[in-house]
Design a protein with these regions (language model features):
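Flexible, acidic/Gly-rich N-terminal and inter-domain linker regions that tether
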Residues: 1-49, 58
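Short, flexible hinge/linker loops that cap or flank conserved catalytic cores
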Residues: 41-43, 54, 93
Length: 289
């Protein structure tokens, strides 16, 4: 009976995943047209601006986000194009109260990012800015220049476990779990909110490893901790299997239950994010606008 129940459970999860993938394909499909169509902003609607910085020095084996190898000239040209696009968006009548900057490595060129954020704040009615970062771009002297520009910085630590860091090609790039703890500890308190991001359900991750990661994350005292399940997209599935291995057991549901229990006294911002204090900063940065 338990075997049949597990089969039904697995089938339901696969059906849900397939249905979601088809829905996304239909929603995001872009048809080529020769018509000059301008989308007019709805004055009764609040819009969020998303800015993507697609450059990285090296790539993580599980990451399926749009990215390119960093080249200084291309990066500066890209930021210049971003600023031009923002001006055109302003001229089209759009306004934004929130801005989310994702990547890639968003702070890969601090001067260009600061200049772009300053322009965004001058063009639009932006009240809050959230930005992602990796552990190599959170030195206090770097973050100080972003006071007044970034309200929440999400730092992708992913794990403090050295074995996971090695298999995920992050140990040599960002340092050991101990070094990561030191880096994040120095960064806490510089900007209004620092969110420490972890990944759970690695193929070889155990319950004990997850609990140690949670304990280490809480110990550095960030304002928010976010825990995402490992996203095994079809695009990256083979790469994940080669670098991280393959598990015949899916612990995502069990691990998520552990996470909810461990953060039961924290404020839940969304399904994955937990804050020490309740915040008004928007955590839902992907929508159908």
């Amino acid at each position: 009976m338990k075997f049949i129940s597990q089969m039904v459970h697995n089938f339901a999860k696969k059906y849900a995943a397939d249905t979601m993938q088809k829905s996304l394909y239909n929603s995001l499909r872009i048809d080529i047209t020769q018509e000059n169509i301008a989308k007019i902003p709805n004055p009764d609607k609040k819009y969020m601006l998303y800015m993507h910085v697609p450059f990285c020095h090296t790539f993580c084996p599980y990451c399926s986000f749009h990215k390119y190898a960093y080249e200084r000239g291309a990066c500066k040209a890209y930021f210049s194009a971003l600023r031009t696009e923002m001006q055109r968006t302003k001229d089209a009548g759009y306004d934004f109260e929130t801005l989310y900057v994702g990547g890639g490595t968003t702070l890969i060129d601090e001067e260009e990012l600061a200049r772009t954020l300053e322009l965004a704040k001058s063009l639009f009615s932006i009240k809050e800015v959230s930005c992602e970062s990796d552990p190599n771009h959170i030195e206090p002297e770097s973050l100080l220049r972003f006071r007044g520009l970034i309200d929440r910085l999400s730092v992708g630590v992913q794990s403090f476990d050295d074995d996971i860091l090695r298999k995920a090609s992050r140990y040599d790039k960002f340092g050991s779990g101990e070094i990561l703890r030191e880096k994040v500890s120095r960064a806490v308190g510089i900007l209004p909110i620092l969110s420490l991001d972890l990944i759970f359900n690695f193929p070889f991750q155990t319950r004990e490893i997850l609990l140690r990661d949670i304990e280490a994350a809480k110990a550095v005292n960030p304002e928010q901790i976010t825990l995402y399940p490992l996203m095994k997209s079809p695009l990256m599935r083979d790469q994940i299997a080669r670098s991280l291995g393959v598990s015949n057991v899916d612990n995502e549901e069990e691990f998520y239950s552990i996470i909810c229990k461990e953060f039961s006294s924290w404020h839940r911002s969304n399904a994955w994010a937990f804050a020490r204090e309740k915040s008004n900063i928007n955590d839902e940065y992907v929508g159908t606008n």
